[in-house]
C-alpha cells in the first residue's frame, strides 16, 4: 500500500492500521465491516474427558467473552463482543439478554470460573491437560490461541498448543488428531440454514469437526429450514442455538471485524461482509 500495492483486501489488524496511518497519512483510507465469519473452538467427541458435558461446559465458562474480547480486538481483527452461532444483532440471532444468561456468556467471570472449577473437580478433571491445534498464521490465529490459553489456565486447565502450517493443520482437523482446535464458520448471508449447518450431526455435514451425532439438533435444523413464518422460525432457531450452546461441543469465540486498507487513489469500492462478495471490481477506479 505504501507504493507497491494499492489495497489489502483480506483485512488489517489494529497495529497494522496504526503503522499505515503513521507512514502514509492521508494517502491511506480504511473501510470496516463485521465479516460473517465466526471463530469457534471445536472439541473432539473422541477425547475421553470431553465426553462429559460438564467438562465441555466448564472449558467454555472459563473464557471471559466480555472484557477479554474487548482487549483481543485491540490487537487483531476480531469483534470486541460475544456472539452465539448466528451473527449478533441479525434477524435470527439470540438477543443479548438471552445469550448473556447462558453459561460461558455471563458477565460475572469470577462467578463463572468458580463454578467451572467446581464442575471440573466434580468430573475428576481438575488440571485437565489437552491439546489445542492452531494454524500457523499470525492474525488472528496466534492471537486467539494465546488469549484462550491464558483464559483456560485461570481455571487450572493445562492446554498445550500445537501449531502447524495450513496443509498439516487442515489434515489434523479433518482426521480428528486434536483434543480442541481453532475452527471457523464462514457465510455470505446471516441465515440459519447456512450458518447452523456446521453444527448438525457429522454424518450430515463434513464441516462438523467435533464429529458428534445429535438428532435433536438435526430435527430443529430441518424444522426451521422448512418454516416460512418468521416468528415461528425464529423460535425454532433460538431453540437450536440454546441447545447447541448448552452441549458445548463447538464454542463460539466471536465474529471477525474486517478492516481493509486502500491507497486513497482507489475509489468506488464498497466493503462487503464476506470475502466472496463484491469482488467484480465494477465501479472501482483510480483517481
Where are these regions (language model features)?
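Extracellular/periplasmic solute-recognition and catalytic clefts
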Residues: 1-47, 184
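Second-shell loop/turn segments in exported
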Residues: 4, 44-48, 55-58, 99-107, ...
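Ligand/substrate-recognition segments at binding pockets and active sites
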Residues: 14-15, 109-188, 230, 255-258
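Ligand-binding "clamshell"
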Residues: 16-31, 175-178, 191-206, 263-267
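Periplasmic-binding protein-like
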Residues: 46, 50-92, 143-144, 244-252
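Extracytoplasmic/peripheral linker and loop segments enriched in polar/acidic and small residues
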Residues: 54, 109-110, 158-169, 195-264, ...
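Structural transition elements
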Residues: 79-119, 138-141
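Long beta-strand-rich cores associated with HINT superfamily self-processing modules
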Residues: 260-287
